[in-house]
Amino acid sequence: MDNRPIGMFDSGVGGLTVYKEVKKQLPNESIVYLGDTKRFPYGSKSKESIIELTKQGIDFLIRQNVKLIVIACGTATSQALEEVKNLYSVPIIGIIDSTVEYLEEKYRNNKNAEIGIIATAGTIKSNGWQNKIKELIPSAKIKAKGCPLLAPMAEEGWTDNQIARLTIKEYLIEMKKIDTLILGCTH
């Protein structure tokens, strides 16, 4: 049995939602969590910067002797995962594949599925979510919306006030009549 910890990386504290779910599913596993709050947010950075920051996070986790790395950040997954996963001997996974695989099962027989995605502008611009959905659910109609204010608001703890509600309401105007809404960033 491999007793090494699982490494988990995010651009901030949003990945703690992934951490909590992994701990619930795998209660006997140890997890090393790295939240890069110093250089947050990633959503407005260039792809090259995100790849470099992701490599630095992975390098830190490798030094912690982890057996697996979970990129618990939608932006880093969509912009850097494909670039970094073959650079290391430790398996590296992100949040996009498992989410879309779940939706593939759900919408396998639905030719009219409408899927909405909200995430950072960089995540939406990368088309990571959209490409995976089109690969696994080709008939799906996709509505994607960059929401640059949500991650900073979540980091500040502004999640249950009038400003948050009005901001979310504005972002969701285009998401009417969807079957599923993907929160494409972990915040």
Predicted region positions:
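Non-catalytic structural scaffold of enzyme domains
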Residues: 1-186
